[in-house]
From Swiss-Prot:
Species in which this protein is naturally found: Bothrops asper
Keyword flag Signal: yes
Record-annotated disulphide pairs: C42-C131, C44-C60, C59-C111, C65-C137, C66-C104, C73-C97, C91-C102
Record lineage: Eukaryota, Metazoa, Chordata, Craniata, Vertebrata
SUPFAM superfamilies assigned to the protein according to its UniProt record, in alphabetical order: Phospholipase A2, PLA2 (SSF48619)
Described function: Snake venom phospholipase A2 homolog that lacks enzymatic activity. Is myotoxic and displays edema-inducing activities. A model of myotoxic mechanism has been proposed: an apo Lys49-PLA2 is activated by the entrance of a hydrophobic molecule (e.g. fatty acid) at the hydrophobic channel of the protein leading to a reorientation of a monomer.
Protein name: Basic phospholipase A2 homolog 4a
Positions of the record's site feature: Hydrophobic membrane-disruption site (MDiS): F130
A molecular function GO annotation: calcium-dependent phospholipase A2 activity
Length: 137
C-alpha cells in the first residue's frame, strides 16, 4: 500500500485522492502508475501544463485541466471513494464536489487505457526542460 501511495504522489503531485487514482490507473491499464506514468512526457507527474508529446501525455494534460476547472472543492485535499464493478469504475459519491473529483480521475484512467497504443517508451522518463508551454485549458 505504501508503494501505491508513492506511485500516485509522483503521478499527480499531491493532488486528489491519490490512492484511488493509482488504483484506477492500474485497473484500467494494467500498468504500474509509478513506473509507467510517474514522469511520462510533459504532463504526467508533478509540474505545470505543457504541450503534450502524444495521446498518453494529452490524457495527463486534460486531467490537470479538469482539476483546474473545479471551483467548489480542493483536488489537493479532498478524498472520495469509488468501486470497481464489472471492470467499470463507479464513482460512489453523493457529494457533488467529490463526485466531480472522482470523475476527473476516472476520465484520466480511461483515457490512458484508450491511448495505450500511443505510449512511447522514449517519453517514459522525459526531462521537463524539453517541454513547451501549452495553450490555457
Amino acid at each position: 500500500m505504501r508503494t501505491l501511495w508513492i506511485v500516485t504522489v509522483l503521478l499527480v503531485g499531491v493532488e486528489g485522492s491519490l490512492v484511488e487514482l493509482g488504483k484506477m490507473i492500474l485497473q484500467e491499464t494494467g500498468k504500474n502508475p509509478l513506473t509507467s506514468y510517474g514522469v511520462y512526457g510533459c504532463n504526467c507527474g508533478v509540474g505545470g501544463r505543457h504541450k503534450p508529446k502524444d495521446g498518453t501525455d494529452r490524457c495527463c494534460y486534460v486531467h490537470k485541466c479538469c482539476y483546474k476547472k473545479m471551483t467548489d472543492c480542493d483536488p489537493k485535499k479532498d478524498r472520495y471513494s469509488y468501486s470497481w464493478k464489472d471492470k467499470t469504475i463507479v464513482c460512489d459519491e453523493n457529494n457533488p464536489c467529490l463526485k466531480e473529483l472522482c470523475e476527473c480521475d476516472k476520465a484520466v484512467a480511461i483515457c490512458l487505457r484508450e491511448n495505450l497504443d500511443t505510449y512511447n517508451k522514449k517519453y517514459k522518463i522525459y526531462p521537463k526542460f524539453f517541454c513547451k508551454k501549452a495553450e490555457p485549458c
